[in-house]
Amino acid sequence: MTTEKEMKQIQNEFKERMDEGELLNCMRCGFCLPSCPTYIESGFQETHSPRGRIALMKAVADGMIEPDEDVERSLSLCLGCRACEPVCPSGVKYGQLLEEARDIIHQNKKHSLGERVMRKTAFHELFPHQNRMRSAVSLIGLYQRSGLQTAVRKSGMLRVLPEHLRTMEAVLPDVPKSKDMKHRPRFLPSIGPMKKRVAFFSGCLMDTMFLPTNNATLKLLQLAGCDIVIPPEQACCGALHGHSGEKNTGKELAKQNIAAFEALDVDAVITNAGGCGAFLTEYDHLLKDDPEWSERAAAFVQKLKDFSSVLVELDFHQMDLALETPQVVTYQDSCHLRNVMHTSLEPRQLLKSIKGAEFKEMEKADSCCGSAGIYNIVEVEMSMKILDSKMAAVKATEAILIVTANPGCLLQMKLGIEREGLSGKVRAVHLADLLLEAAGHKTS
């Protein structure tokens, strides 16, 4: 429970740090309401809408209300999907307001011992250190390959876990071997004439748990005519930190990544995870008040592109792409790829170019799936409501292949498939893996 002293400090910092001009930009028109999943799934509660949350932020900053548990609950229930931003006639940067508010609350509130341990372990000891990430993911691999997973499942021990965690265990990808995660290339030449020289942002989860997808992305870029530089000094993007009130750690990771990429002579910096790419894209905002880093951040941001944009730019979709077996395919937008990186047409263009892939657009493909980083772990009830609505839209397309471009979305869609009893009938894949399959190559 937040104390009076803590609430007073939070209120003072809202007044000092929240962007008054941005808060006032909200005209309360309500254009954002139909795009907000939590507003809809909460039964149209105003406090769970972008407009309502901005009103609460403004009221706290003006001293009209205290930043009590109700305010904190409203802000924590937001997915941060930012679907409200493209439809806002005033161009309110809602995501930036939300992250600032969450950071203020986190920095000034006393957390339970369990939460402090969890945050320190995940945000400070694990994600920023790639060697530790590899070790942690290797333990999951050991669990999967040693026979322990089979024994645990047969014993019924998983029944002690909440249902969503049992299902999550069932949909975890097969983890790569430790040696494959350790030995990563620093340079890969184009296959055929070189058209672009690019750098690749590997990510932390993407280069461990989802390593085959990173390998697929690299192979696609090579086939499209890219020389690829992969700087080993790069780090976690900091997205989970920024979204969870760990802004200072996010800034340090941003500086490490800018330093790793800025000296490279490349045409673009490529990402293949919507959540990572979106946070990288906003490094200029994150470091805008730092005189040493603001210009460097702005220069870095200018080079960022999703891999799908580069593939279309290099006419990869004109290649002979085909599936061995004709399949109905649908696409679930990564919220941050669509709403922050403004990349939605290119993935569809690539999918529609695959022979044997009958593309069917699902209803509200641009609406969040409920993953939202760690939201599906900390806000289970709302996340599953949103997922159930999403799976109803998927089933209406009769697709047997759900494609997305973000690891969190991918796991969430696999979770939805498992919950709906569609395992073995429907599969979820990352766009890069499907494209490599369609190009006649195996994902390694």
Curated annotation (Swiss-Prot):
Its EC number is 1.1.99.14. Keywords: 4Fe-4S, Cell membrane, Electron transport, Iron, Iron-sulfur, Membrane, Metal-binding, Oxidoreductase, Repeat, Transport. Gene3D superfamilies: Alpha-helical ferredoxin. GO terms for biological process: glycolate catabolic process. It is found in: Cell membrane. It catalyses: glycolate + A = glyoxylate + AH2; (R)-lactate + A = pyruvate + AH2. InterPro entries: 4Fe4S_Fe-S-bd, 4Fe4S_Fe_S_CS, Cys_rich_dom, Glc_ox_4Fe-4S, Helical_ferredxn. The keyword Membrane applies. [4Fe-4S] cluster 2 binds at residues 36, 78, 81, 84. It is an enzyme of class 1 (oxidoreductase). Binds 2 [4Fe-4S] clusters. It comes from the Bacteria. One of its GO terms (cellular component) is plasma membrane. Its cofactor is [4Fe-4S] cluster. The keyword Cell cycle does not apply. [4Fe-4S] cluster 1 binds at residues 26, 29, 32, 88. One of its GO terms (molecular function) is glycolate dehydrogenase activity. Residues 14-46, 69-100 form the 4Fe-4S ferredoxin-type domain. Pfam families: CCG, Fer4_8. Disulfide bonds: none annotated. The glycolate oxidase likely consists of several subunits including GlcD and GlcF. Component of a complex that catalyzes the oxidation of glycolate to glyoxylate. Is also able to oxidize D-lactate ((R)-lactate). Does not link directly to O(2), and 2,6-dichloroindophenol (DCIP) and phenazine methosulfate (PMS) can act as artificial electron acceptors in vitro, but the physiological molecule that functions as primary electron acceptor during glycolate oxidation is unknown. PANTHER family: GLYCOLATE OXIDASE IRON-SULFUR SUBUNIT (PTHR32479:SF17). This is Probable glycolate oxidase iron-sulfur subunit. It comes from Bacillus subtilis (strain 168). The gene is glcF.
